[in-house]
From Swiss-Prot:
Key words, A-Z: Magnesium, Metal-binding, Transferase
EC number annotated for this UniProt entry: 2.5.1.-
Annotated source species: Heliobacterium mobile
Binding-site residues for Mg(2+), renumbered to this chain: 38, 225
Catalytic residues of the enzyme: 38, 86 (proton acceptor)
Name of the protein: Isoprenyl transferase
Length: 260
């Protein structure tokens, strides 16, 4: 079991997790893990609680996931916090989500910064409410030079929108004669995505049992290994995170090719 150098919380290691951790090959750790944080509403409904209670419980799951990222030297973690479609939810729920973002940054930023976490945002951040946007921008600026772990928070993010915006940027350059269309390939296209300086995810985790990408990292996930669990996000803990890594290491990643 790896030694936790800087715990975000005081989560205890279960016997199940310890048994799983013994199966992990430290030389085959995924560099980039992405997570669709799904199931907060259902978790709250099953307990007769308001939906915001599920979102609040989900914040603690993120804390546990960050612990595991530290333990196993994960370099990049990208979490789907708020999609471009989430604006369709009731206004009180949307407001509560952004209040939770501000609360989380106020409570955790100094700890994250002192431990070398760099916070980044991907999505149409300029359209976020003023207060949360400013707090997020402060966190991004404060942690900009950190290198221990990059935490990408997808806010007001949509995979299709991201691709369309990248295409529009390249089309403008082509119209101005600044790029030859024959120069445009996958690598060139990737430079115009929100994740331009981030490697594609090796592993995408989907709690709640849903079998869809939900418009998340569509371009980047072409060869990503996907791991789905019926566990709802607020119940997602260290054991589930370690299980995902173990299962990932059991996959044969071919990237479209065949071994001969």
């Amino acid at each position: 079991m790896p030694r936790r150098l800087w715990p975000f919380g005081q989560t205890k290691t279960s016997a199940d997790e310890q048994a799983l951790s013994e199966q992990i090959d430290p030389h085959r750790i995924p560099k980039h893990i992405a997570i669709i944080m799904d199931g907060n509403g259902r978790w709250a409904k099953r307990r007769g609680l308001p939906r915001v209670a599920g979102h609040r419980a989900g914040v603690e799951s993120l804390r546990r996931v960050l612990e595991v990222c530290e333990d196993y030297n994960i370099a990049y973690l990208t979490v789907y916090a708020f999609s471009t479609e989430n604006w369709k939810r009731p206004a009180d729920e949307v407001n509560a989500l952004f209040d939770l973002l501000v609360e989380y940054l106020h409570r955790e930023l100094n700890t994250l910064h002192s431990k070398g976490v760099r916070i980044r945002a991907i999505g149409k951040i300029e359209d976020l409410p003023g207060g949360p946007r400013r707090e997020l921008e402060k966190a991004i600026a404060k942690t900009a030079n950190n290198t221990r772990l990059v935490l990408n928070v997808a806010l007001n993010y949509g995979g299709r929108f991201e691709i369309v915006e990248a295409v529009k940027s390249i089309a403008r350059l082509a119209a101005e004669g600044k790029v030859n269309p024959d120069q445009i390939d996958e690598k060139y296209m990737s430079q115009y995505l929100y994740t331009a300086d981030v490697p594609d995810p090796d592993l995408l985790i989907r709690p709640s049992g849903e079998l869809r990408l939900s418009n998340f990292l569509l371009w980047q996930s072409a060869y990503t290994e996907i791991w789905v669990t019926p566990t709802l996000w607020p119940d997602f803990g260290r054991k589930e995170m370690v299980q995902a890594i173990v299962d990932y290491q059991g996959r044969d990643r071919r990237f479209g090719g065949v071994k001969v």
